[in-house]
Amino acid sequence: NTIETAAPVIRDRHMTVQPQPHMVRDVTQVAHAAKLRDHEIIDARAAARFRGEAPEPRQGLRAGHIPGSKNLPFTQLLNGDHTMKTIPEMAGEFQKAGVDLSKPAITTCGSGVTAAVLSLALERIGKKDHSLYDGSWTEWGQFPTLNVATGDS
């Protein structure tokens, strides 16, 4: 590898942002999907947090996960050097987590950040019908009217 020492050339670029509302879900949509079980809800948090065995880093949140969701910690999609695994390896991780890729997917995590790693992996393996719940556990875990599951399922 060569390290360049020259100053970078900075150029103006134009980019037009196209909103993609179908790629984001809110708490009402996720609650509906959890009730109907017509989507795969995939949680990127560590297994202990998903199972409700580890305390939540945000005060006042219940421990556990969205009922019916599957756990695939985002770190399982990464190599030791923090690059993403190969497409076949990532597809295998979704399969090992019990994710039914024939259903539309909703990714979630603690606050909507690491769920994006799951969404990127889904996109890379060719799955187009996925969305991200950006409220994630920070939102779900604070509402006493929403059910919470613990354990592996």
Annotate each predicted stretch with a short phrase.
Residues 1-40, 44-153:
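Rhodanese-like catalytic fold shared by cysteine-dependent sulfurtransferases
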